[in-house]
């Protein structure tokens, strides 16, 4: 296991280091590429990440030479030391062509395969020999390279097998007897066609049917429950059902997407509705957090009832007693009233910083103490069923003000529950009055148009609030972190974050930074790299 961790660490270090400096290569590459048909496929565009991170701007050649000297201080073999130094100063000297994307996949033998294109096979030889030397220094068996014509192979323990030639480098990790077969197939099959990932920096592809088969194959299915779940999942998976997830660093934004293709969703047709966003008029534009989704309650109620009465529910052991079925029926009746947007909002939090004297140190600390908050839940409803029943079963906690209008007060919290036409409103220190500066005009409003559902976190509001903004600084001081200015800089970077679904089977999550002109990865690089350099330099001297 120690050897496996070493090889994984070596791959990660080489890949991460390559993002610091990438040089072009004129080596030929395989032109023909195969469609991705693996159960799981992972993609990493190191060249693109390196350029977006602008690492060369923040890491000088002198600093890399200094790190190389530090890394080889205890290496007596001069050839090994020279090769380590050459890799640190230029990571393409490892022999791997990091100007090309690298990827990994789960093959038919349930082994994970790592694939990269080769720039210089001789340099890869030197890199493997260097790794072997370092492993031997650690008291482990060295790595031996076997070569037949242009192909070299090696193994590390029983669970890691590698093979490479002048075109590509492959490593297989697994726990079965098919490692050699896996790596041989990986080395000779065409490279994967990664065009489906577009301009993504990091991405994954999941073949839903193959993953399902791997999870529920015959030797793993040891009871009726697993088999029933597998069969139930099958009805939703089309012939080429797959999921593509990606992470991309853009100017001022970090974008993560998750898209599902060829799934059978006819059963849920009409369940979700596009949000009309009318509720945003009752919310302030500087609200801390907003959750909104469009729903057809009648269909949801039918789906719940269908599931409770299904064979799958019976196999799963969901056996409701009479009282539970009555409660579920009441809940479904309430759900059926929902007909459109449901919105939950946390508009603000108010509090004070209470002084706390430490008698042992003589220091005065400040403890955040929440006094109140403003929050609400709004629903588009088709009738007055919900508010009528809430009023009926409130048991004196709510006082009737008028028809379909209830209120109460607990300390600093004023509770309002009322319905106006088709709007059901429940608020804590909030009422259904139009905001002077509504959330429909907020900086994030343009990002959630034509959505089936979305969630927003407004970092600007959290930071600018006297109470919530001070909590972050207090936490830093309490933790006694050395680089508190760095953490404060990271705090200043964030503007807002949102996740939205413009299609029922597609989701996009975005972190928006206040500087929208500079690539988001470079913004993090500019803050974090100087800290890392300072820390590493300090460890040398």
In which residue ranges do the predicted regions lie?
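Short, hydrophobic/proline-enriched secondary-structure or compact coil segments at domain edges
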Residues: 168-171, 243-263, 372-380, 424-427, ...
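Long, C-terminal catalytic modules of enzymes
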Residues: 431-541
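Extended, charge-rich low-complexity interaction segments
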Residues: 74-75, 174-181, 227-244, 317-326, ...
